[in-house]
Swiss-Prot record:
Keyword tRNA processing set for record: no
A cellular component annotation (GO) from this entry: plasma membrane
Oligomeric form and interacting partners: Interacts with the Sec translocase complex via SecD. Specifically interacts with transmembrane segments of nascent integral membrane proteins during membrane integration.
Function in brief: Required for the insertion and/or proper folding and/or complex formation of integral membrane proteins into the membrane. Involved in integration of membrane proteins that insert both dependently and independently of the Sec translocase complex, as well as at least some lipoproteins. Aids folding of multispanning membrane proteins.
Low complexity: compositionally biased ranges: 30-52
One MF annotation (Gene Ontology) recorded for this entry: membrane insertase activity
Keywords: Cell inner membrane, Cell membrane, Chaperone, Membrane, Protein transport, Transmembrane, Transmembrane helix, Transport
This protein's encoding gene: yidC
Name of this protein: Membrane protein insertase YidC
């Protein structure tokens, strides 16, 4: 296999990967968008087995820290809206990114409460969700204040007192949700806590920020973690098909994911909880947990607690909230390579202070580490090229005798100490690293709206002037012209001729950070080719004159 065939293999693998990604994203039929009023009225019946009721109408209170702005409904205490104040909706916009939303066309809420036999959120105990009382309608984290606490109180008809407390800290996206239950009666109370995330499956146009069909589609859907299964995705269409999750675990978490952002309920690690998914009807899916019952004796008080993550997928901060929560960053099936690569990229950024220059630096590092494989690949291909005259003579001599041809070719390879797969094996090792870098650059929120230099103001967006994709195509064309070839098939020659153009078209819609990586990688390839060819010339395995005549 010569270097141009090698390039063709990479191209075919790449295109096949893109087609597979697009098919995975688009193969499921999409449900119709429904009205929020329909979804809320059906939630109670659909999740009846969990004892989780629907939301109702109550007063909306606002909670604001330096990084979060939450809207909480006093009817049940659900979070119906979450704005991420440090992340603009679009580059240059003063409007913050909205993660949780409750509108006629789309619902994405973080619900929580107390259910079980005597829980106030059990639809059998009340006419609806408990209506909590608060001291104020607005809570704002003041300057010099590090924590904001929002107590909400409710007393049922039997006189039992329930306090639901939200606690938010400065600079944090983890929200503490605690419950104090005081039994004022003469009989024990049986209480379970729950946390549920529900979302409309089909995205309205204003929230559909997915990549183009030529680029990677990051995962959007549910996920969970237990001590036995540290990270499992759960597709929305799986929930819609009623193939629902139903596992018990001590510790773990449940989440809903999208590119760059996530919400997750983390129950107390010392309590066994049931993790579930549910189709709430009308195109709304839910994932949640329900804790094991707690007995509250007469005159006694019990405490229950959980944590809600609502924010960007910042790996080190998520790892502090719960084990394996950092795995929600969608690095695909090569996460075990992408994660250390991102840690290296972040370490480089701590010195350079620019994500674009950090991408350039990590490209040099990765290609430097892979240089021995690249050298072995080029050496093997050079040896194979030198054997081509002997192989051609062998074909002419043996004709259609394939068995003898195979035997003599293997004997020739053995005599010349050439591995026919030597050009492929290094490529097979490099491809996972190549794809892991691809996932890493596409899935890291740190690159969202991150500027580089000159006209590149957002490394997560496409080049507005298409300069980088054209430069990438030019470097690919130059590599192709530099590379020796023994390709004689006219069809392969045509494919190779148009491959830089095809790749340039593909990369027009790719994030500029990813295109930058490919440009630098191609430039490194050009440098490494020159070094390797000079060494091969000294060994008599390569001739520049032959390349010029070819």
């Amino acid at each position: 296999m010569d270097s141009q065939r090698n390039l063709l293999v990479i191209a075919l693998l790449f295109v096949s990967f893109m087609i597979w990604q697009t098919w995975e994203q688009d193969k499921a039929p999409k449900p119709q968008v429904q009205q929020t009023t329909q979804t809320t009225t059906t939630a109670a019946g659909s999740a009846a087995s969990q004892g989780v009721p629907a939301s109702g109408q109550g007063k909306l209170i606002t909670v604001k820290t330096d990084v979060l702005s939450l809207t909480i409904n006093t009817r049940g205490g659900d979070i119906e809206q979450a704005l991420l104040l440090a992340y603009p909706k679009e580059l240059g916009s003063s409007e913050p990114f909205q993660l949780l939303e409750t509108t006629p066309n789309f619902v994405y809420q973080a619900q929580s409460g107390l259910t079980g036999r005597n829980g106030p959120d059990n639809p059998n105990n009340n006419k609806g969700r408990p209506l909590y009382n608060t001291e104020r309608d607005t809570y704002v984290l003041a300057d010099g204040q590090d924590e904001l606490v929002i107590p909400m109180t409710f007393t049922d008809e039997a006189g039992n007192a329930f306090t639901k407390t939200f606690a938010l800290k400065r600079g944090q996206y983890a929200v503490y949700v605690g419950y104090d239950v005081k039994n004022a009666g003469t009989q024990p109370l049986e209480i379970s806590s729950f946390g549920q995330l529900k979302q409309t499956i089909d995205l309205p146009s204003h929230r559909d920020t997915g990549s183009s069909n030529f680029a990677l589609h990051t995962f959007r859907g549910a996920a969970y973690s237990t001590p036995d299964e540290k990270y499992e995705k759960y597709k929305f269409d799986t929930i819609a098909d009623d193939e629902n999750l139903n596992v018990n675990a001590k510790g773990g978490w449940v989440a809903m994911l999208q590119q760059y952002f996530a919400t997750a309920w983390v129950p107390a690690s010392n309590v066994t909880s049931n993790f579930y998914t549910a189709d709430l009807g009308h195109g709304v899916a839910a994932i949640g947990y329900k804790s094991e019952p707690v007995q509250v004796q007469p005159g006694q008080t019990a405490k229950l607690a959980s944590t809600l993550w609502v924010g960007p997928e910042i790996q080190d901060k998520m790892a502090q909230v719960a084990p394996h929560l950092d795995l929600t960053v969608d690095y695909g099936w090569l996460w075990f390579i992408s994660q250390p690569l991102f840690k290296l990229l972040k370490w480089i950024h701590s010195f350079l202070g620019n994500w674009g220059f950090s991408i350039i630096a990590i490209t040099f590092i990765v290609r430097g580490v892979m240089y021995p494989l690249t050298k072995a690949q080029y050496t093997s291909m050079a040896k194979m090229r030198l054997l081509q005259p002997k192989i051609q003579a062998m074909r002419e001599r043996l004709g259609d005798d394939k068995q003898r041809m195979s035997q003599e070719m293997m004997a020739l390879y053995k005599a010349e100490k050439v591995n026919p797969l030597g050009g492929c094996f290094p490529l097979l090792i490099q491809m996972p690293i190549f794809l892991a870098l691809y996932y890493m650059l596409m899935g890291s929120v740190e690159l969202r709206h991150a500027p580089f230099a000159l006209w590149i103001h957002d490394l997560s967006a496409q080049d507005p002037y298409y300069i980088l994709p054209i430069l990438m195509g030019a470097t690919m064309f130059f590599i192709q012209k530099m590379s020796p070839t023994t390709v004689t098939d006219p069809m392969q020659q045509k494919i190779m001729t148009f491959m830089p153009v095809i790749f340039t078209v593909f990369f027009l819609w790719f994030p500029s950070g990813l295109v930058l990586y490919y440009i630098v990688s191609n430039l490194v390839t050009i440098l490494q080719q020159q070094l390797i060819y000079r060494g091969l010339e000294k060994r008599g395995l390569h001739s520049r004159e032959k390349k010029k005549k070819a």
